[in-house]
Structures are given as C-alpha cells and as structure tokens.
C-alpha cells in the first residue's frame, strides 16, 4: 500500500538529496528501499532475510547494494572501510527495545559528521522503538512523519 510510504516520502523530500549515501537496516520486500534509491546517490541495504524482490530491485536500479546477513556481522566486517560511511542511516529491523537499541548503537559509528539517523515504527504499537531512541538521544528533537518514520539530526 503506497499510502504507507507518504511519511517516508516526506522525509526523503525534506532531507535527502542526490549526493547522499544511505544505510538501510532492514529492507523486507524493498518497498522503502526503492524510495530511498530514488532520492539518494547510493543505498546499502542490509537484511537477514533474502527476498527475490530485492534482487529484482538491485537489477532495476544502479545505486543499490544489498548485503544479506545480520546487521552486526556486516557492519563489523566493514567498519574499517572508510567508504562504508553514510549521510543517513534508516533503521527498520526488529522493533523490540533491545534490537532497536543495538541497531542504533552499532550503526552510529558509520554516520558521517552532521549525518541523520532515522527509522520506522515510532508508534504506541512498538514502545521499544521510542524507548530506545529516547534513551540514546535524550536531548535530541525527534521529527515524526505520518507513516511513523522518525528522524534525528545527529549534530
């Protein structure tokens, strides 16, 4: 349902430009991935599940690199690579407190100075998402979009 992407599209229009690199943590069927690719210079998407839709998307667009595996394994194996740095990190993996917190903490070192951290499912349905974000960024303003996407400027 494309209406579910209205908020992410608003986020992209407001904050993403065609010089930016994005790390997407959790791609599922690649619907949000395709939208991120439309706006950004380059998108690296990580997911532990392999979906044919992602393979088809990777063939269709020239600015997507999909990495299959666990977030921690892929990030740890690439963390010394200076080219594995991002202007925006979009977190949409598991939605419980522990996983959201871990996803944010392991990805933050990959964020370029002045980069943006964002994600999905900031809603009462997933209280762990909000709890982890507020704990890690206690003094940051959180911008919430209509599809429950969220964004923090990492100043």
Predicted features by range, described:
Residues 2-155:
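S-adenosylmethionine/decaboxylated-SAM
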């Amino acid at each position: 349902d494309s209406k579910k992407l209205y908020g992410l599209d608003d986020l992209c229009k407001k904050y993403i430009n065609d010089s930016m690199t994005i790390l997407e943590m959790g791609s599922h069927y690649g619907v949000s991935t395709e939208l991120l690719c439309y706006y950004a210079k380059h998108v690296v998407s990580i997911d532990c599940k392999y979906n044919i839709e992602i393979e088809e998307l990777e063939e269709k667009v020239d600015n997507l690199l999909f990495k299959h595996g666990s977030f921690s394994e892929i990030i740890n194996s690439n963390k010394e690579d200076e080219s594995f740095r991002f202007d925006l990190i979009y977190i949409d993996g598991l939605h419980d407190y522990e996983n959201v917190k871990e996803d944010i903490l392991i990805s933050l070192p990959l964020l370029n100075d002045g980069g943006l951290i964002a994600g999905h499912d900031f809603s009462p349905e997933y209280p762990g998402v909000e709890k982890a974000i507020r704990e890690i960024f206690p003094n940051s303003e959180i911008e919430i979009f209509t599809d429950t996407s969220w964004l923090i400027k990492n100043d």
